[in-house]
Amino acid sequence: MARADGRSDDALREVRITRGYQDWPAGSVLVEFGRTRVLCAASVQEGVPRWRAGSGLGWVTAEYAMLPSSTNTRSARESVKGRIGGRTHEISRLVGRSLRACIDLAALGENTIALDCDVIQADGGTRTAAITGAYVALADAITWLSAAGRLTDPKPLSCSIAAVSVGVVDGRVRLDLPYEEDSRAEVDMNVVATDHGTLVEVQGTGEGATFTRSTMDKMIDFALAGCSELSRIQSEALAAPYPGELPGGAA
């Protein structure tokens, strides 16, 4: 069965990365995977969590949330409910540890970079879009910190990080699932990888069926190829000058 949007099984949706979407954070990005849109902001904060104080190491943390109207049925804000849901906690932790995989925390000194990922519109793959966009916001925050003279190493990023969903739908392995496919997938997987082709995290579940080792291998092959293309798109976005004003008027 053909995909509703006409893509081949191994094709990404149209991906757009817009840097400098907000004026105030050190890094901000609007990332779009098809109709999924996520605003990713990287804010620099002096100091680190209490358990890390005195270590000389920095920290990178993340918070993920969905706007009430990001889906076709409005959901109440978790702040109004009085508790953060398990899914939100899980994805926030995933984004944070994915981005920590690419950075030398010692180079930050005792500074924290907080990544806020807010889903404006959800059509599948929000967590993978958040990771992909958050890396670009993080890279811009590193540029800002470097201009401010607050890094002990001018190049603390060892690689880029991207993520994509992959699954089995209608018996076929498919890349970058929109909601229409994700909601009926027999197998669902999220893959986080570096631009070197190494894996950061793999989350896979047989939602409606078990799956074979050969199917898993094909899914990971599709995902790594997709992450490679996403890394290229990230690199193109970051090739342009820093989109805001740097400390000290640096260009």
UniProtKB/Swiss-Prot annotation:
PROSITE patterns assigned: RIBONUCLEASE_PH (PS01277)
Annotated GO biological process: rRNA catabolic process; rRNA processing; tRNA processing
SUPFAM superfamilies: Ribonuclease PH domain 2-like, Ribosomal protein S5 domain 2-like
Single GO MF descriptor: 3'-5'-RNA exonuclease activity
EC number(s) from the headed UniProt entry: 2.7.7.56
Reactions mediated catalytically: tRNA(n+1) + phosphate = tRNA(n) + a ribonucleoside 5'-diphosphate
Pfam families assigned: RNase_PH (PF01138), RNase_PH_C (PF03725)
Enzyme class: transferase
Residue ranges of the TM segments: none
Binding site for phosphate: 87, 125-127
Function: Phosphorolytic 3'-5' exoribonuclease that plays an important role in tRNA 3'-end maturation. Removes nucleotide residues following the 3'-CCA terminus of tRNAs; can also add nucleotides to the ends of RNA molecules by using nucleoside diphosphates as substrates, but this may not be physiologically important. Probably plays a role in initiation of 16S rRNA degradation (leading to ribosome degradation) during starvation.
Name of protein: Ribonuclease PH
Organism taxonomic ancestry: Bacteria, Bacillati, Actinomycetota, Actinomycetes, Pseudonocardiales
Gene: rph
